[in-house]
């Protein structure tokens, strides 16, 4: 009985260590990508981030989106940037949600859509992005009350798309 109990106590520890062993290499790869990006080595950054992004890492997805938006190591492509932002946004990444709002505000890769922009700014603000409320409030000066009502409704009803 004592052996079984000891085994049961060790199982959670082994499980936690297994998870940590999986997460630490992913974080190390992401950090290696950030270090490369910060020194202007965009090819290395993209090589580190792409597999992580494809595996669902929201930070890597946002970083790939930003690379496509800025043309860092890849041709500038707002559509591809948006695709990566959407993947990260679906996981609650507030930076990606903010950038989706910016793209909708300024028509980067999509037609200007103030209602959609307001929606994304609201979602980003709800997830803690400190810049989103200011962008959202500035946008209200360009919107009708009906547009604001619709945008708030969309933000309340927004649910991440499941793959």
Question: Where are the regions that the model predicts?
Answer:
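Bacterial N-terminal signal peptides
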Residues: 12-23
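Short helix-capping/linker turns of helical repeat alpha-solenoids
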Residues: 40, 54-57, 70-72, 77, ...
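Bacterial N-terminal signal peptides that target proteins for export
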Residues: 2-13
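Terminal, low-structured helical/coil segments at or just beyond the last alpha-helical repeat
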Residues: 130-163
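Hydrophobic face of amphipathic alpha-helices that form TPR/SEL1-like repeat modules
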Residues: 29-36, 48-52, 63-70, 74, ...
């Amino acid at each position: 009985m004592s052996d079984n109990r000891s085994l049961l106590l060790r199982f959670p520890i082994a499980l936690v260590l297994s998870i940590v062993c999986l997460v630490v290499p992913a974080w190390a790869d992401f950090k290696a990508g950030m270090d490369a990006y910060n020194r202007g080595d965009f090819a290395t950054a993209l090589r580190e981030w792409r597999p992580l992004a494809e595996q669902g890492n929201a930070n890597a997805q946002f970083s790939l989106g930003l690379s496509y938006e800025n043309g860092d190591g890849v041709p500038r492509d707002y559509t591809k940037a948006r695709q990566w932002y959407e993947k990260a946004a679906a996981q609650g990444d507030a930076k990606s949600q903010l950038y989706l709002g910016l793209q909708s505000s300024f028509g980067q890769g999509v037609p200007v859509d103030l209602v959609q922009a307001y929606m994304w700014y609201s979602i980003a603000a709800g997830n803690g992005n400190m810049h989103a409320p200011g962008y959202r409030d500035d946008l209200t000066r360009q919107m009708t009350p009906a547009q604001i009502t619709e945008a708030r409704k969309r933000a309340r009803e927004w649910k991440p798309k499941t793959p």
